[in-house]
Amino acid sequence: MYVLFEGIDGVGKSTQIEILASKFSDAIVTKEPGGTQLGVNLREILLRSSIKIGKRAEILLFLADRAEHFEKLVAPNLGKLILSDRGFISGIAYALANDENLDENVLLELNKFALNDKFADKIIFFEASRELISSRLKARGTSDKIEARGLEYLLKVQSLMKQILIKNGFETLFIDASKSIELISKEIENFINFK
């Protein structure tokens, strides 16, 4: 089962992935970007490098990572539990936040191509309030290029993610990130149907 954990930075995705992975030792844990060697290199360019990249070029680099990630890591392991920290929902939402003139349907089709027509089986979306996001980002102390765009930008991305999920009817668990770690973990296990 291919499961995406979606949401902006600081909402608890990584924590919940770690908890689930500790319970299922054969789970494949990955992330986008950065789940493959190409992804590691692209992540460095996209998030940390001083290289200025155009908006459309940025989208295509993320799509290249997604295609490589799917072909090399996801597709060969589709019979196993795959836990991915981010995926195509993030890709589309960040692209739309960066350029409102983009067509969501075109972005969806490009992602469908990159994923060889195989979207995630289940998606877990973490949503947080302005206050929670602000406090968690401050507690982390560091930021990449995307986080540096500010709180309003991240809230816009979060809103776009939610809209995309609802509009397209993907099988999604909507998580209130302010709930306790334990309660969220139980909700996720019930959603994935592991007992």
UniProtKB/Swiss-Prot annotation:
GO cellular component: cytosol
CDD domains named among the record's database cross-references: TMPK
Domain of life of the source: Bacteria
InterPro entries: P-loop_NTPase (IPR027417), Thymidylate_kin-like_dom (IPR039430), Thymidylate_kinase (IPR018094)
Kinase is among the record's keywords: yes
Uppermost EC category: transferase
UniProt signal peptide: none
GO BP term, example: dTTP biosynthetic process
Recorded GO MF terms: ATP binding; dTMP kinase activity
Catalytic activity: dTMP + ATP = dTDP + ADP
Pfam families in the record: Thymidylate_kin (PF02223)
Protein keywords: ATP-binding, Kinase, Nucleotide biosynthesis, Nucleotide-binding, Transferase
Keyword Translocase: no
Residues the entry annotates as binding ATP: 7-14
EC number of the protein: 2.7.4.9
Described function: Phosphorylation of dTMP to form dTDP in both de novo and salvage pathways of dTTP synthesis.
PANTHER family in the cross-refs: THYMIDYLATE KINASE, UMP-CMP KINASE 2, MITOCHONDRIAL
NCBIfam families with a match to the protein in the record: DTMP_kinase (TIGR00041)
Family to which the UniProt record says this protein belongs: Belongs to the thymidylate kinase family.
Name the UniProt record assigns to this protein: Thymidylate kinase
Natural source organism: Campylobacter concisus (strain 13826)
